[in-house]
């Protein structure tokens, strides 16, 4: 019987990936469609992906699939063919290719079955997730940005918006997608007669959000096809002005893709212009925050003097201090300080 999960340590897998000579391509894709047996589908797909040396993070649920992966360049076309023939619903699914890619985004394949591929918190049985807004392509996006009757809504988390967003886009201040949905409805009531344009990283969140807005009575709703990634790619290919400012946060080891030269965020320690996310080097903290090179040197990659001092302690003493401490990593929020999160790199499904 085939092994359907990883049995090798993370450290060993990461070292193996870093030693690879063949370049990899980072790809993301999603599809809302009915999966009758998510576990059975997961197990079958796991075998397909492992045979092609695919790494990454894949979620499956009755409502569909959400994946961020890396594929050896020589196997990308084979991967595409096998994915498209795996299920009729996946035939022709859009594959978002990373804009900036060193091929080191993932080093292990994790494939999980969940209740939802995006944690939305929606429990309304009358909600129809298929009743989505209209797609906007790159040229349409730029036209909408110049339309005074249009309002752009960023459906990403605060730490994503902080480092990059579309011109004049509204932030829905929240730490998770499930918190954003009701806030978006509340905040946009005063703009109910406007054209609502929603966007996110790759399209999965804004697609569901557009359906939620229509469910709540908003009639003029659009969402950007393929999200920021596809918009920037197509705009560059077509010679259009790229109207996204700053960096696009991504949920892998890269933590960001440069879209424009502007740096709109600031170091959380000294306030210098900076948009590079990192995790505190203190294993007892792992705060996700923005740190400039000067502060990284000053604090030895830590988020505070306290963590810097703790990192300098003998390993045994560090372990003793971590014992009993809340087992969860944190994200820095400028308005609320430290927040708990489940991963060093936040979970894209949250």
From Swiss-Prot:
Location of the Rhodanese domain: 146-240
Keywords from the UniProt entry: Oxidoreductase, tRNA processing
Domain of life: Bacteria
Catalytic activity: uridine(34) in tRNA + AH2 + O2 = 5-hydroxyuridine(34) in tRNA + A + H2O
Organism classification: Bacteria, Pseudomonadati, Pseudomonadota, Gammaproteobacteria, Enterobacterales
UniProt-listed GO biological process terms: tRNA modification
Family (UniProt): Belongs to the TrhO family.
Pfam assignment, any one: Rhodanese_C
EC number: 1.14.-.-
InterPro entries, per the entry: Rhodanese-like_dom, Rhodanese-like_dom_sf, Rhodanese_C, TrhO, TRHO_N
Name the record gives this protein: tRNA uridine(34) hydroxylase
Active site (record annotation): 200 (cysteine persulfide intermediate)
Region listing for Disordered, in residue ranges: 319-350
Function: Catalyzes oxygen-dependent 5-hydroxyuridine (ho5U) modification at position 34 in tRNAs.
Classification via PANTHER family: TRNA URIDINE(34) HYDROXYLASE, UPF0176 PROTEIN YCEA
Basic and acidic residues biased stretches: 319-328
GO function terms (MF aspect): oxidoreductase activity, acting on paired donors, with incorporation or reduction of molecular oxygen
CDD domains, A to Z: RHOD_YceA
């Amino acid at each position: 019987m085939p092994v359907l999960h990883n049995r090798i340590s993370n450290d060993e897998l990461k070292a193996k990936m870093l030693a690879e000579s063949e370049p990899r391509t980072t790809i993301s894709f999603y599809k809302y469609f009915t999966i009758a047996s998510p576990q059975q589908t997961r197990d079958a797909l796991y075998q397909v992906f492992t045979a092609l040396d695919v790494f990454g993070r894949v979620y499956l649920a009755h409502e569909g699939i959400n994946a961020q992966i890396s594929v050896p360049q020589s196997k990308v076309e084979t991967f595409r063919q096998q994915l498209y023939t795996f299920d009729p619903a996946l035939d022709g699914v859009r594959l978002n290719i990373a804009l900036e890619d060193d091929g080191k985004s993932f080093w292990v394949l994790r494939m999980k079955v969940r209740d939802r591929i995006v944690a939305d918190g929606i429990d309304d049985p009358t909600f129809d997730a298929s009743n989505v807004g209209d797609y906007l392509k790159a040229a349409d996006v730029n036209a909408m940005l110049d339309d005074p009757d249009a309002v752009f809504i960023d459906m990403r988390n605060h730490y994503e918006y902080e480092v990059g967003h579309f011109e004049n886009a509204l932030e829905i201040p929240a730490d998770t997608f499930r918190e954003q949905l009701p806030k978006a409805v509340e905040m946009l009531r005063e703009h109910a007669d406007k054209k609502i344009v929603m966007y996110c990283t790759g399209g999965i969140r804004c697609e569901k959000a557009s359906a939620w807005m229509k469910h709540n009575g908003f009639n003029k709703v659009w969402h950007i096809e393929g999200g920021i990634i596809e918009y920037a790619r197509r705009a560059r290919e077509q010679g259009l002005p790229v109207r996204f400012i700053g960096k696009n946060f991504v949920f892998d080891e890269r933590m960001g893709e440069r879209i424009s030269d502007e740096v709109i965020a600031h170091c959380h320690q000294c306030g210098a212009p900076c948009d590079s996310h990192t995790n505190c080097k203190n294993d007892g903290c792992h705060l996700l925050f923005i740190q400039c090179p000067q502060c990284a040197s000053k604090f030895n990659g830590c988020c505070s003097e306290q963590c810097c001092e703790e990192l300098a302690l003998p390993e045994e003493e560090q372990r003793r201090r971590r014992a009993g401490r809340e087992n969860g990593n944190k994200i820095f929020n400028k308005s609320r300080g430290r927040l708990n999160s489940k991963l060093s790199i936040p979970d894209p499904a949250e």
